[in-house]
Amino acid sequence: MSEINIILVRHGEASASWSEDPDPGLSKDGINQAKKLCEDESLKNLHNFKFISSPRKRAQETSSFLSSKLNKVLEINNVFDEIPAKGVLLEDKMDWLKSIASMPIKDLPISVQEWNKKIIDTILSINQDSIIFTHFMVMNAVVAYAKQFSKLVNISPDYTSTIKITAKDSQIISLKVGDQKKTKINI
């Protein structure tokens, strides 16, 4: 099997925090960040790439300028949605997320372990060059798997930063993490 290129893109800055709105769109800064993806030299040759997004507004809105420029249809894939926090109240989500971040992967709640496994299984089964617009924790799940880290959170991807993956024979053979920065959603 030939090499498959996969690019993960973190969404732009959201108009509200995770604890304030379960599905915010992009802020004005987030819209500008998404527009700048069209000028990113490393994202120029995406004509043969499949465009995939989390179902969340901020991920879809982040993809919109680049997908429009390249006349791409966006596929929504629930696997790349944010970390599941079923039963966690909005006002408690940040504290919950901090506890998840410091927990060994093997001790994560079953729903989070299943979410993590689906992400990895899906990444390893992609058979076409793809760009995926997604979330902080999804990107961390992929890095933790590829680098065999014991905890889920190991990087702080900036808004609209990328992780470039090369996969072959259902294995990640290279991974390059883009810009990192502490953002208001990061822990």
Residue ranges: model-predicted function:
Residues 149-177:
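Domain-level recognition of soluble alpha/beta enzyme cores
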Residues 11, 135, 181-184:
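Histidine-centered active-site/metal-ligand motif
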Residues 54-56, 79, 133-137:
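Short, well-ordered beta-to-alpha junction loops that form the rim of enzyme active sites
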